[in-house]
Amino acid sequence: MQLLRLRQLHNGVFVRMSRATINMIRMVEPYVTYGYPTRANVSRLVYKRGYGKVNRSRIPLTDNSIIAGALGEQGIHSVEDLIHEIWTVGANFKKANNFLWPFKLTSPRKGFGTGAKKRHPFANGGVFGNRECLINQLIAQMI
């Protein structure tokens, strides 16, 4: 879980899907839910819950100068550039993602759904596992 930077309950991170990360997600699947967010949800997450990592301290992303100072060498100068890099999984995705602090989300409004069972995967009416595009509804409830 620490390799995925998921150290607390209801934390969220972006991950580039590769063979190694898929294997890591398989190992922690009973404890996490994942899917493919839309650009609007990525933008909403960064604007509402986004914090940057500057000198190992958690800084809110209130000004583009914070991003330009940390990621200017990679061509990322504003919040929109950061969102674009995360959404497109560009060449500087790793640096942009490591700059972002893991998102601290709230517990979902109205719970995880009626009749959702903790010990079953999402495909079988549970909570954890791959939600694919339905992750967007959960993100909207947790922002």
Locations of regions flagged by a protein language model:
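Core subunits and conserved enzymes of cellular information-processing
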Residues: 2-143
